[in-house]
């Protein structure tokens, strides 16, 4: 049947078009993530060698990455006005860090706090162990994707898995995998921990793990390395995200 043949050919062409669009999207996502990696490594090299010319190239690439984004326009304008006055690589990169990435860091931190609170709540309230594992995994993957988007690394499906693998590798490399009472007690207090139910305690531990994953994701996705002492404190994030839950539970 001629018409049936045309219909099959049209469906096949449509299928190929969809596949092509997906491939283009994934390649674009990989390219975007790779661009952030290159800027981050170039910034580390410029700082290590105190190379002002290399630092200016980093700033040019960084402003290009965020060109067209309304949430960075004010920072880009301030950076443009002041960068000519900087004659030191570390000072120039610190200026870009403050003006461009400061608001993005705050947004990323809010994402981590929200995800940690959500995971802790779901673990505490859902009695099925497998269900809370699935919920925690989904929350962590969404959090990593959102953090990547905040810093300009739009990730597709394959890009998300690559990013997740990079975050987990970073966690292992920095030894920030485990968390338990020794981490929570200085933050929430030993007397409070002793009053919590087992399930609620598990929720706090899972929330704390999510916070650590979030901080690792920020370090991986951020186009500039953190200056010494500027890295987000996992403990402060845990305290902000989970202390309200503990207060509610302990009443």
Predicted regions and their residues:
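Membrane-spanning helices that line or support transport/gating and their immediate boundary helices
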Residues: 22, 26-30, 150, 212, ...
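Membrane-interfacial hairpin junctions
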Residues: 1-8
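Small-residue-enriched, tightly packed secondary-structure blocks
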Residues: 98-214
